[in-house]
Amino acid sequence: MRKVKGIKADGIGLKSKTLSDRRCYSAQSLFAFESNKSWLLILFFNFIIIPISSFAQKKRTKMNDKQIVIYQLLPRLFGNKNTTNIPYGTIQQNGSGKFNDITDKALDGIKELHVNYVWYTGVLAHASLTDYSAYGIKPDDADVVKGRAGSPYAIRDYYDVDPDLAVDVKNRMKEFEALVKRTHAKNLKVLIDFIPNHVARSYHSDTKPKNVIDFGANDDVTVAFSPRNDFYYIPGQPLVVPTNGQKTPLSVLQDGKFDENPAKATGNNVFSAQPKYDDWYETIKLNYGVDYQNSEKQYFDPIPPVWLKMRDILIFWTHKGVDGFRCDMAEMVPIAFWNWVIPQVKKVNPDLIFIGEAYNPKVYKQYLDEGKFDYLYDKVGLYDGLKRLIRNEPNADVKDIRFIWQQESAGFGHHMLRFLENHDEERIASAAFAGKAELALPAMVVSATLGGGPVMLYFGQEVGEPGKGQEGFGGDDNRTTIFDYWGVPNHQKWMNGGLFDGHKLNGAQQNLRNYYKQLLKVTSKSDAVLNGKIYEVPVTGNMNNRMYAFIRYSGKQRLLVVANFDRNQTLSANIEIPDQVLKAKSSVPVTELLTDKKLNIPAGTNIPVTLAPVSAQVIEF
């Protein structure tokens, strides 16, 4: 979810969050080790390599044989074949993808990228300006909806799916269940969002099971806080809807009013009847038993009603076949809740995974250990450091990579989810980020190999989607809108009218997708990546602060990763191969895995490394 400044999470301040296809490979830029097991070496971008031990990474108690590779997509956007793209356009004008659009062919295309989890974003019924009152769904007020399609993170019914995504609205849940079944049939697992911190101001469940009580139905609205309330209130004051003073096509639907008296606290911890336009004004903060306005005093015994309601919601979707939950703004919910709820839900399915959207490195370990999360975002840290390198910013430095695994996530790097794109972040190919998707390839390699945790792609990333244009509420913000009905141009070329064969992609887009495919083929099953330790490699020659090398190794495999983020300088160096490495062989056969080129390195020599700017190699020997 898009972030704003000044948020606190569980009493701890969070950092704010703002919202040429040339790959030159040198056949000689290889570093060899001798082993009686298979070896894997990945070389990136002009780099010199000499292996010495450094900080060892903590091993898992359980050995894994496959890396989790997640593919995030919004069904509303993913299957939309309409190319009209009118800013603020209606669903009739701009169209919407459906659950049914995610066909067997689509899933096969996703699986080609060596994906094993699909994160379906925006599944749950959320506030929207499209009228489904004919189906018994109460219309939403335009004054508290962002965009015409609405934010997928302003949930209006936790027991329903978004009617936009159904061909037959009456059977929308059955269409979602069929998608889950199709996904599982392809040996893929299903992730959906769990948004625990807030709900839409219009929250009302039309489809809740019997005996389920809506949020706020039994609240005492005369008090600002009660441990038994679901919401926080501003007694005696009605809500004042914010405005930015700008006219849009949606202005005719807005009257500047929303009937909420007393006003409820806003989702980003704003305890005021007059939230600002930049606040999450369309949402209501849920009460987990923390009195934020009185020294954040906690009331967790007896169990707060919201805890019980949220447990039941998670179990409901687990019974639908969901295999895991990406938990929105996990740090804005008390650790005690996660410690309580995750084990309970895992009693229903022990193989469930919980991924926390997290931005405060100071509490990462706490949310993993006490909070029981399986994985956390590595946004503040690796993503931010890699983005600086990709953008060629003056303060970019590979020491940020070193800091991540040696300090920030030392001992739990395999619990960190690495990515370069998601719905909150700028598209790599956007003008504000890199301007060219290929410039991020060394960073993608580092993301996929630095730890054994999950790696994630955002749909369209693999074909260089630029997130360009004025979409509506999303604006021209270098992202693909999550608030509007929209077609995603580069992705639509791969979709090719539902054939999902990529025949409309140009050569550069096809090459980019193939690169992602080959890289993840190599890394997703690498024992060194999944279960190995990590060593930093000191280098010589002309290496600078835009070049980095490290080794991932296990008893079965060793992996050398060399990355050159420098846009201009070719890396040139000689690597001295120690005698003990090559003493059993007169030469070392190697295979460059991205091209399947087979090479031999003579024994007892220095190996010249020559790698062009922004290039990579994957070499097995």
Mark where each language-model region is.
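Solvent-exposed beta-strand/loop surfaces of large extracellular or lumenal domains
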Residues: 588-604
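Bacterial N-terminal signal peptides
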Residues: 42-51
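Short, solvent-exposed turn/loop segments enriched in Gly/Ser/Thr/Pro and often Arg
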Residues: 74-77, 119-130, 193-203, 328-334, ...
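C-terminal beta-strand-rich structural cap/linker in extracellular carbohydrate-active enzymes
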Residues: 601-621
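N-terminal structural segment of carbohydrate-active enzymes
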Residues: 57-189, 197-199, 204-207, 219-220, ...
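Loop/helix patches that line or flank the sugar-binding groove of alpha-linked glycan CAZymes
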Residues: 65, 81, 128, 146, ...
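Alpha-amylase-like alpha-glycosidases and glucanotransferases acting on alpha-linked glucans and related
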Residues: 61-70, 154, 164-180, 205-324, ...
